[in-house]
C-alpha cells in the first residue's frame, strides 16, 4: 500500500508572492505563505518514496499526478483522501498498472449520495455481490470495531458517475465504532466513510488498505512534527523542501534501526555516540 497525503510545513512561511515584498514594510495580499508538501508513503515498509511541493493545499490535485508519474507503483494499491478523488488521478494510477482506493466526500456530491443511499438500504434489500468484513480491537482503554461493506454491482450507481472513473470495480463503506471510557461512563463514537476502488470485490483487502493509509499520518507526519519539530523550523526558499527530504530519510533510518527505543531517544543516542550513529547510517534494511 502506498499512501498519498499532504502536510503543511508551517515554518516555511514564505511564498513566491512574499518574496517580492522581502525587505519592505508591505505585506502580501494573500495570507497563505506556508509550504504544502505531498508525500508518498510505503505503509508496509515505513519509507517515504517521494515528495513534491505545492504552495497551497488545493494544488494537491495537480501535484499528485506529477508525484505518481515519478514513482514505480506497478501492482501497488494507492490510497488517497477525498482531495485526491479525481478522475484524472484515477486514470494516472490505472495507466501506471496500479490499483486505487479513493475516499469519496462532498466534492463529488452525486457519487457520494448514491453510495450513501446504497449502504443505507443494503441491510434491508440484501443485494447480491456484496462482501462484508468485521474486525474488533482493544487498546489504550478503548474498544474499536471496524466494519467494511463492499459491492461490485456498479449498476446501483448512476452510469455517468461510474463509467467516467478508469478501472472502477467496487465501492465500499467503512464504519468505525469506538467505545471510549469517560468520567461519566463509556462514550460511543461512530464514523462512516465511503470509498471507490479498482480492486476486485474483497472487503478485507479494502479495509486493510484504508487502515494502512492512516500510517502516513501516525508514522510520518506526526513523527516529523513531534520528533523533528518540522513545523517550528523557519526556513526559506528551497531549504524547507531539502530539510523535509533529509528528515524523512533520517526517520526511515531510525525506524529500521534495531533498537526498541523511541525515535527521540534514538536521535539522542546517535548524537552522544559515534558508534550508534554509524550503526544507524549502516542500516541494511533501509
Regions picked out by a protein language model, each given a short descriptive name:
Residues 20-21, 96, 117-121:
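Short, hinge-like loop/turn segments at secondary-structure boundaries
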Residues 90-98:
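Short, surface-exposed basic-aromatic patches at helix termini and helix-loop junctions that form
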Residues 105-211:
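An anionic, glycine-rich sequence signature occurring as long contiguous blocks
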Residues 99-104:
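Short hydrophobic alpha-helical runs that function as membrane-insertion/retention elements
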Residues 1-80, 85-88, 260:
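Conserved, well-structured functional cores that handle cations and Mg-NTP chemistry
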Residues 200-234:
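Short amphipathic alpha-helical "interface-anchor" segments enriched in bulky aromatics
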Residues 69, 98, 120, 124, ...:
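Generic secondary-structure signature for well-ordered alpha-helical cores
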Residues 223-286:
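A short, flexible helix-boundary coil/loop motif
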